[in-house]
Amino acid sequence: MNTSVTEFVIPDALSVTITDDTLCVDLTDGRTISVPLAWYPRLFHGTVEERNKWRFIGKGHGIHWDALDEDISVEGLLLGKPSGESQASFKRWLNTRGN
């Protein structure tokens, strides 16, 4: 049986746009990935100000929100992976915010 290996090159993030219900990330290969904000509960429950204070990590391999303690990788976005945070962890975080 022959198998072939396909190299999967992960592009870097160029820009991030967040609306009330969508996270959009423009990539260096020309694609734009849009996912439901509900996939990332910390972003969903964050304020507009908190959502807009992001920075690239790993030279564009990911995005970090300091105030929300959230990290999202470009690879995870491309693979369609929502947040892997447990409900218990998220509830603890939400309780620290007084929600």
Regions found by a protein language model. Give the residues of each.
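Motif-centric detector for short Cys/His coordination patterns
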Residues: M1-N99
